[in-house]
Design a protein with these regions (language model features):
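Short pre-active-site segment immediately N-terminal to redox-active cysteine/selenocysteine motifs
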Residues: 56-58, 63-66, 139
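Conserved redox-active cysteine motifs that mediate thiol-disulfide chemistry
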Residues: 62-79
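A short beta-strand-turn-helix
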Residues: 37-58, 81
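N-terminal targeting signals for export/organelle localization
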Residues: 1-37, 156, 164
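Short, internal strand/loop/helix patches
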Residues: 90, 102-139
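Thiol-/selenol-based redox modules, centered on thioredoxin-like
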Residues: 15-19, 135-164
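Alpha/beta-hydrolase fold active-site loops
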Residues: 57-58, 87, 131
Length: 164
């Protein structure tokens, strides 16, 4: 009987810890606040500073070359960035090697800037898994976030929250 109680107690504690962690990831601390400062450097050497994009809605996508779901959503983001010139799309390459980033860029071309993070961090946004996408309004406020691969209809929903 004592062993059963210990096992049940352990299961309860693990379940509680998992739930608390995932609840925090579902509501990153940046929601409703100014987006933390973040900049990327493209393969062409240009720096894109997300905080300088105020005045235009921003879709900020954290990804990595080794992330299967990131590859899955790549075409959706590329198509949306071409269709929505009123929205700035930025890809923040995360926890990757330079060669992994370069190979990914060659295999999955897109028109929006992407590159490794050179200012700020994914942690400041509360990223707990990849891909993670943040939707920032024209005033620089993080309106929504989504963790996991975006499909076209989900992306359209979130674009509606930041586009006028």
């Amino acid at each position: 009987m004592g062993a059963v109680a210990v096992v049940l107690g352990a299961v309860l504690m693990l379940s509680l810890a998992w739930g608390l962690q995932h609840a925090a990831l579902a509501n990153p601390p940046v929601l409703g606040r100014m987006a933390p400062k973040l900049a990327i450097q493209t393969s062409g050497g240009d720096q894109v500073r997300v905080w300088e994009l105020q005045g235009k809605p921003v879709v900020l996508n954290f990804w990595a070359s080794w992330c299967g779901p990131c590859v899955e959503e790549g075409g959706v983001l590329a198509d949306a960035s071409s269709a929505h010139s009123d929205v700035a799309f930025v890809g923040a390459n995360n926890q990757d090697t330079p060669s992994g980033f370069q190979a990914f860029e060659l295999r999955h071309p897109h028109s929006y800037p992407a590159g490794p993070i050179v200012t700020g961090s994914y942690q400041a946004f509360g990223v707990g898994g990849l891909p993670a996408t943040f939707f920032i309004d024209a005033q620089g406020i993080v309106v929504a976030s989504f963790t996991g691969p975006l499909d076209a209809s989900t992306l359209d929903h979130y674009l509606g929250l930041i586009s006028s």
